[in-house]
Design a protein with these regions (language model features):
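A short beta-loop-alpha structural element at the N-terminal edge
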Residues: 31-44
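Active-site rim helix/loop that mediates acceptor-substrate recognition in acyltransferases
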Residues: 53-79
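Conserved acyl-donor/pantetheine-binding loop and adjacent beta-alpha core of acyl/acetyltransferases
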Residues: 87-115
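A short, internal acetyl-CoA/4′-phosphopantetheine-binding micro-motif in the GNAT/acyltransferase core
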Residues: 114-123, 151-153
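Conserved acetyl-CoA-binding loop-helix of GNAT-fold acetyltransferases
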Residues: 118, 124-137, 165
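Conserved GNAT acetyl-CoA-binding A-motif
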Residues: 139-152
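Conserved active-site alpha-helix within GNAT-family acetyltransferase domains
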Residues: 152-172
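C-terminal "cap" of GNAT-fold acetyltransferases
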Residues: 175-226
């Protein structure tokens, strides 16, 4: 398992035999995945809002709410530049997404990927696979299920194939009322969780690669001089 707080991965990580198609080559590169820093939020916002129709737009207030509340909010860095980000919430989180609510109505304990965004110039270079390896290594120590959605109205085949190659399957569909977008609700069972839970309960070892959930992050206030 990769380190949680900061991991340097050869990306993309070697998939399981059923994940690598014959004849497809991979170019190794160095990617660092680490917790986001508050001063990077403007860059994260720009990445999100330039991602196209497959990702819902954000405003600064909602992004700061993610920063303050998300259990997992990490960025990928390559050559000193942000290459993407992933935001996730545990099932007990105070998160107001309608897709998160859809899962919460049906499953008592899960980890939800709210969004993953990869910079356009980095797509196809393994950043997404590096993120999913990292978020799974975090989630499987704490949750039995990993959940997300794929929008079906914007050329979904690449995203569906990507998630299928990681073992996700559709468990239903949801029409998002505010934006009238139909989403494939996808889930993956995390096979390591039962053993981890039985062996350690809530007392995971204090190891660097195990890490800890992000704590609530108060927004920094700037002095006004008044």
């Amino acid at each position: 398992l990769p380190p949680v707080r900061q991991s340097r991965l050869a990306a993309p990580p070697a998939p399981q035999p059923h994940q690598r198609p014959h004849g497809v080559g991979f170019t190794p590169m160095s990617i660092v995945i680490r917790d986001v820093r508050e001063h990077e939020l403007d860059s994260v916002l720009a990445l999100n809002n330039n991602a196209g129709s497959a990702i819902l737009p954000l405003d600064s207030a909602r992004l700061h709410a993610f920063y303050e509340k998300a259990e997992y909010f990490r960025v990928a860095e390559r050559d000193g530049n942000l290459a993407g980000f992933l935001v996730g919430f545990g099932s007990d989180s105070d998160h107001d997404s309608c897709n998160f609510a859809w899962f919460k109505e049906r499953y008592p304990h899960f980890f939800y990927i709210d969004r993953i965004v990869v910079a356009s110039r980095r797509r196809g270079g393994g950043v997404g696979r590096a993120f999913y390896a990292d978020v799974q290594s975090y989630a499987e120590l704490r949750y039995p299920l990993l959940c997300c959605e794929v929008f079906l109205d914007h050329g979904a085949d690449p995203a569906l194939l990507f998630h299928g190659s990681f073992g996700f399957h559709e468990v239903g569909q949801n029409v998002m009322p505010d934006v009238d977008v139909r989403a494939s609700m996808m889930m993956k069972e995390l096979c390591s969780y039962p053993w981890v839970r039985e062996t350690y309960g809530d007392n995971l070892p204090d190891l660097p690669w195990v890490g800890r959930p992000r704590r609530p992050q108060p927004r920094t206030s700037l002095a006004t001089g008044t």
